[in-house]
Amino acid sequence: MRLVKQEYVLDGLDCSNCARKIENGVKGIKGINGCAVNFAASTLTVSADGKEEQWVTNKVEKKVKSIDPHVTVRQKHIKKSADDGYRNRMVNMLIRMAAAVILGAAAYLVQSGTIEFFLFLGAYLIIGGDIIIRAVKNIIRGQVFDEHFLMALATIGAFLIQQYPEGVAVMLFYQIGELFQGAAVSRSRKSISALMDIRPDYANLKTKNGIEQVSSEDVQTGDIIVVNPGESIPLDGKVVQGSAMVDTSALTGESVPRKAAEGQDVMSGFINQNGVLHIEVTKGYQESAVSKILDLVQNASSRKARTENFITKFAKYYTPAVVIIAVLLAFVPPLVLSGAALSDWVYRALIFLVISCPCALVVSIPLGFFGGIGAASKAGVLVKGSNYLEALNQVKYAVFDKTGTLTKGSFEVTEIKPAEGFTKDRLLEAAAYAELHSQHPIAESVRKAYGKMLSSDEIESYEEISGHGIFAKVNGTEILAGNKKLMEREQIEDVPDENAGTIVHVAVDQRYAGAIIIADEIKEDAAQAVADLKSLGIKQTAMLTGDSKQTGEAVGKQLGIGEVYAELLPQDKVAQVEALEAKLLPSEKLIFVGDGINDTPVLARADIGVAMGGLGSDAAVEAADIVLMTDQPSKIAEAIRIAKRTRRIVWQNIGFALGVKAIFLILGAFGIATMWEAVFSDVGVTLLAVANAMRVMRLKNK
């Protein structure tokens, strides 16, 4: 069955509570099996099996309109200026505010109580009529406890106890606050979008008629594009002419440019700093690095952090609870306390209603996490969900694969040790034929060391033995090449113990032929990566390798790794990770870092799987929870630092918002605070929380 996946922009979505309602509403549409609203990015992603795209769009538009008529659904590829809508709303609100202020001022000047009432009522309806209408519509739909209902109830209550000026003023300042909040959220969204907006706008396509500027989506695989100095490379490809220094920071987070010359691969998103590059396109727009990165980051909102889910549930119960307390506060004290005036206690209850809206939390928390994901992507770390970003704070066990992760994986033959009766050339030739069809870096190093032509026609049979090595029959000669386990399995005698490097043992016709010693260089930042993790509170580090125990322990000792598990088959690595996870407390997490070549099962099994080396292996990217765009293990510590900053800022907002609300609830209950102060505190807390949430993007990584 065909899966339809559509992404929409929700123009006018400035209410996080509305975002939650839209997500739940669209999820309830029959035929739609997946939905996620990203409030921070104003996007809605929907998936449906076996449905036409237009059917999905019509259903979504109808449902969104029924939930919030002010939100317009737009397909993502259709461009629209968001500023125009906001500017129109602002002008409209300023006119209404001016009219309300004039009527309110006139009410103070008249002597008649009736005229005063109608002037204040007119001012109230001008400034708050839309809030009343939305509250009534939501009540009809069964959506009672939202900010519109609370403000309508509080201000109408003020009119009922003849506090006309405060009823108008509270609605006026609430609308001003909404305007500022909308501006703050809009600015935050633009900041995050700008941070991640690495998609080139156009491509210079080389045609028979010269160079034509076209959309990147219109370029086909095999086309030649021209990238001038200062331009961004629009599509993945291979340089066929020219050379230049390219800035890769948008993808990798690395500030040092690297050279791109003829024959080298380049990725979309790289910026040409000098020279002119002619590039043959190797991947279409949807398969390019930039598209994959943006897709990963923007879809991260569908995997919400536990804190986000907690705040959503908290808001669901917090608002009704405060309303119930407000009702009790209004009517119980006058019944049990002698001399207590009903109007005084109703006024105090109205303060409860004003302060009960949890906007500061439900707006700033998603922005904080999305900002953290954006900051991580700018540093070359792609986090697939805010749940994984939050989980990085709980990591206590860091487990690394060795080859290609902590070492460069660029093997070189350093020594050839033939057994008695064999020459170095004969030993190397036998190993090269055995490794002819293998794609493993060790096999490539053996073939490179042999350096002569190899004919696959001479190979009569070939078998890769997982975790052991290779069996090949060449011109009637049986060759075994692999580790010591392979020699033991095939009962090869006289196999010596070798301690240095990675060893390929070779046997010819069941007779031991010798050993080839291969060295793998440790990455420059590997030791620092392990040290940084320990400084961040990681309790234990471990390394998994299929190499010999001596080789593994030598690398582990050099890097300061606590535990080394060697001579592991691919399936043994999964079992070992499970055994390590069993040692952890329920609140602790294990992170596994692999290079993505053969680590897919372990990446999928670990609490947090991290694939290194960018988007090269689709299977690894699919299985991993976090993708590093470079081959630097030190990026792990950087990701954890960003995660810790994000958590710190999110909990600052939670503590600040709840603290201020608690103070004003107490002050309101004792009759110390006024409705004016309550609405100022509510608006102020929200604006400060949004501003604080964006700090995560401005903090420099150390």
Curated annotation (Swiss-Prot):
Name this protein carries in UniProt: Cadmium, zinc and cobalt-transporting ATPase
Disulphide-bridged cysteine pairs: none
Pfam families: E1-E2_ATPase (PF00122), HMA (PF00403), Hydrolase (PF00702)
Coarse class of the protein's main subcellular location: membrane
Residue numbers on the Cytoplasmic membrane side: 1-86, 137-143, 187-320, 364-648, 695-702
Regions crossing the membrane: 87-107, 117-136, 144-163, 167-186, 321-339, 346-363, 649-670, 679-694
Annotated GO biological process: cobalt ion transport; copper ion transport; metal ion transport; response to cadmium ion; transmembrane transport
PANTHER family membership: CADMIUM/ZINC-TRANSPORTING ATPASE HMA2-RELATED (PTHR48085), CADMIUM_ZINC-TRANSPORTING ATPASE HMA4-RELATED (PTHR48085:SF5)
Residue sites binding Zn(2+) per the record: C15, C18
Family membership noted in the UniProt record: Belongs to the cation transport ATPase (P-type) (TC 3.A.3) family. Type IB subfamily.
Species of origin: Bacillus subtilis (strain 168)
Residues bound to Mg(2+): D595, D599
Outcome of gene disruption: Arrested in competence development and sporulation.
Entry GO terms, CC: membrane; plasma membrane
Superkingdom, natural source: Bacteria
Keywords, in A-Z order: ATP-binding, Cadmium, Cadmium resistance, Cell membrane, Cobalt, Cobalt transport, Copper, Copper transport, Ion transport, Magnesium, Membrane, Metal-binding, Nucleotide-binding, Phosphoprotein, Stress response, Translocase, Transmembrane, Transmembrane helix, Transport, Zinc, Zinc transport
EC number: 7.2.2.12, 7.2.2.21
Entry annotated with the keyword Manganese: no
Regions of this protein lying in the Extracellular compartment: 108-116, 164-166, 340-345, 671-678
SUPFAM superfamilies: Calcium ATPase, transduction domain A, Calcium ATPase, transmembrane domain M, HAD-like, HMA, heavy metal-associated domain
